[in-house]
């Protein structure tokens, strides 16, 4: 009996700690449930004070793995979309580049026509030829002489662009009839673009002239500016191109007098620092170019007779008729070539005499031969003949240095 009581007591004592431990476990589970309910955590399989922290870390890792799975699932789609966007951008850039490649040559071609290239070539050849006249020996060909020549040439080219550009700005309606291929008349350049080009050319020309500190060069530039503006600008007492005499006088004075005397003085007096003493070559060039410039001034109006007549420009071609003006120009040139042959024959240098006599004789013969097949009523033919006269103009400057 006593043994039974002792066994029962031992069992009770063993059950009490187990019950107590169970009670503690239940309380911890309850507190853990409340904590998880409050903070959204999940109880792990083990207890302890780090269970909450470990549970939160586990959730973060689970979220990271979930995001990675979503990325892996959507990455092919994203890559396809990125490739599509990149492809569209590449095609857009390629299209823009092709458009630019097409537009740049067109704009350059329009600018080339805007500058009136036959006048540009005349300026380059004329100034180059006249700048060589003061040179007496190879010792004169220095870097200073080259720099002075480049100052004269660059400023003159800019002034040339100003003059021809200003004329186009004021002749847009006339050029739509006479010269529809010009960029302002055809619409390739806007009026604003033309104005910017004209103003920029003027500023550059004057700036180069001022920087050179050459009185002859500045004089030539300012006179060219005044005469070029008076020729084209439609204002009271201006627009001299309406009058045949004033129009011819503007072209003659610039092409014949200014180019020969001013640029000769610039090279001899300002660059080479020598006293101004005109030579036989520069006197001959001035007189001969007076004839040639008069012909250019008269002949250029023959192809433009329709537009000039329509807009009230009283050119000599409008007043006398194109055929009479045509033969007047031919006779003036032939007379000038005859005088040039006599001037060349008076040279004491045999080589120079041969070059000037035969050179001018050959040019006169070419002019006469082509003039016999005239078709004044054909605008394309008369325009082509006008360009031929400019070629004779260029050729003359190659002969002028041999007239000594």
From Swiss-Prot:
The keyword Cell cycle does not apply. Pathway: Cofactor biosynthesis; tocopherol biosynthesis. InterPro entries: AtHST-like, UbiA_prenyltransferase, UbiA_sf. One of its GO terms (cellular component) is chloroplast membrane. Keywords: Chloroplast, Membrane, Plastid, Transferase, Transit peptide, Transmembrane, Transmembrane helix. Its main location: plastid. Pfam families: UbiA (PF01040). Residues 1-81 form a transit peptide. One of its GO terms (molecular function) is homogentisate geranylgeranyltransferase activity. It comes from the Eukaryota. GO terms for biological process: vitamin E biosynthetic process. It is a multi-pass membrane protein. Its EC number is 2.5.1.116. The chain crosses the membrane at residues 114-134, 146-166, 190-210, 217-237, 244-264, 282-302, 325-345, 348-368, 380-400. It catalyses: homogentisate + (2E,6E,10E)-geranylgeranyl diphosphate + H(+) = 6-geranylgeranyl-2-methylbenzene-1,4-diol + CO2 + diphosphate. Gene3D superfamilies: UbiA prenyltransferase. The keyword Transmembrane applies. It is found in: Plastid, Chloroplast membrane. PANTHER family: HOMOGENTISATE GERANYLGERANYLTRANSFERASE, CHLOROPLASTIC, HOMOGENTISATE SOLANESYLTRANSFERASE, CHLOROPLASTIC. Involved in the synthesis of tocotrienol (vitamin E). Catalyzes the condensation of homogentisate and geranylgeranyl diphosphate to form 2-methyl-6-geranylgeranylbenzoquinol. Possesses low activity with phytyl diphosphate as substrate. Tocotrienols functions to limit lipid peroxidation during seed germination. Belongs to the UbiA prenyltransferase family. Seeds of most monocots are enriched in tocotrienols and contain only small amounts of tocopherols. This is Homogentisate geranylgeranyltransferase, chloroplastic. It comes from Oryza sativa subsp. japonica. The gene is HGGT.
